[in-house]
Amino acid sequence: MKKTIKRRIGKILYHVIGKRLPLSGARVSFGARKFRQFCAHLMLEDCGKWVNIDRNVTFAYDLKLGHGAGIGANCQIPSGVTIGRQGMIGIDVLMFTNEHRHDDITVPMGLQGRTEIEPIVIGDDVWIGSRSLIMKGVHIGNGAIIAAGSVVTKDVPAYEIWGGNPAHFLKSRLPGAEQTASAPKEGERRG
């Protein structure tokens, strides 16, 4: 009962005030970062310290947010997402953990319901560039970087840099590893 009341108070404060406060890095931010952090701790069951949820972020209340994680302005994060410690999510990033059903051609897609949630897991110290799309069921390994504007449709190993549509391997962050992706052969597709 106490958790439910706490969560409701957090939701009201966040949606009425927190979402509308200036960006966290603005010259005059009116304590926006600390206020949204306070709201996140009220709403989320698993929320680390020193998190930053920026302006106009929409997120599900089962979001798991690690210590020091940051979510940029205008992101949309659905149910079933975990963001590890020190994860950096750029502005306008969209995540999808399910989709519309489309199996029955005799029924409009909008009336067929949605598929089951396939969780997205983003590891520790991951940087996801602005305006990227992260699709259902994707796991992004620790230390990975996703280039801005990428569409991530499959798992990304730890300490690799991926980009493109669909996202593909660009380079490793590990010393001594192959540092660039080889050019695709004639007729071969990446991703």
Regions found by a protein language model. Give the residues of each.
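Flexible glycine-rich beta->alpha loop in the catalytic core of nucleotide-sugar glycosyltransferases
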Residues: 82, 100, 150-151, 157
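Flexible, glycine/small-residue-enriched loop-and-beta-strand segment within the central core
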Residues: 30-37, 58-66, 70-138, 165-166, ...
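Beta-rich strand-turn-strand
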Residues: 129-145, 150-154
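Terminal amphipathic alpha-helical/low-complexity segments used for targeting or macromolecular assembly
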Residues: 1-43, 49, 101-105, 125, ...
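Conserved active-site beta-strand element of glycosyltransferases/polysaccharide synthases
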Residues: 162
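Alpha-helix termination/capping residues and helix-transition junctions
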Residues: 44-45, 153
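Short conserved AdoMet
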Residues: 48, 139, 157
